Amino acid sequence: MFRGNHPTRVDEKGRLKLPADFKRRIDEQYGSQFFITSKDGKVAEIYPLQEWEKVEQKLAQIPNMNPAKKKFLDRVNYYGQMVEMDAQGRVLLPQILRESAQVTGDVVVFGMQSYLEVANHEAFKQNMELNPMTAEDEQALAEFGL
């Protein structure tokens, strides 16, 4: 399980060096293949291939004519790309996603349980300020026992 956050950088070639804590977990559990994508173009989502295959298994249960499935697949395939981690623990973020999510230079990598999320540090801070946790959010989470 991935948790916490680690500030890092995306180099001029678009490579993200995976933070040591996350890389250790990846080495122990997953291997070097990933599917990198986004549902909104605002953040990059890095799925170990085994975790992405779980998403695909769930998608396979949804009829192909379902409009939500089509929208989801359109987006994740538009931004998505299979990548392999190199010997230095780096993954190449797809150019279209780097540009859309502005994930160049200083970024932050969040553990999102089964995948990693990469965000532009400044844009993420602004989004948190514009969208604070509300009483409604807390109530919705309380319904799940959180």
Swiss-Prot record:
GO BP term, example: negative regulation of DNA-templated transcription initiation
Gene: mraZ
Classification via InterPro entries: MraZ, MraZ_C, MraZ_dom, MraZ_N, MraZ_sf, SpoVT-AbrB_dom, SpoVT-AbrB_sf
Organism annotation: Acidobacterium capsulatum (strain ATCC 51196 / DSM 11244 / BCRC 80197 / JCM 7670 / NBRC 15755 / NCIMB 13165 / 161)
GO cellular component, one term: cytoplasm
Gene Ontology molecular function: DNA-binding transcription factor activity; transcription cis-regulatory region binding
Subcellular location(s) per record: Cytoplasm, Nucleoid
Protein family according to the UniProt entry: Belongs to the MraZ family.
Keywords (A to Z) from UniProt: Cytoplasm, DNA-binding, Repeat, Transcription, Transcription regulation
Binding partners and assembly: Forms oligomers.
Keyword Transferase: no
Protein name: Transcriptional regulator MraZ
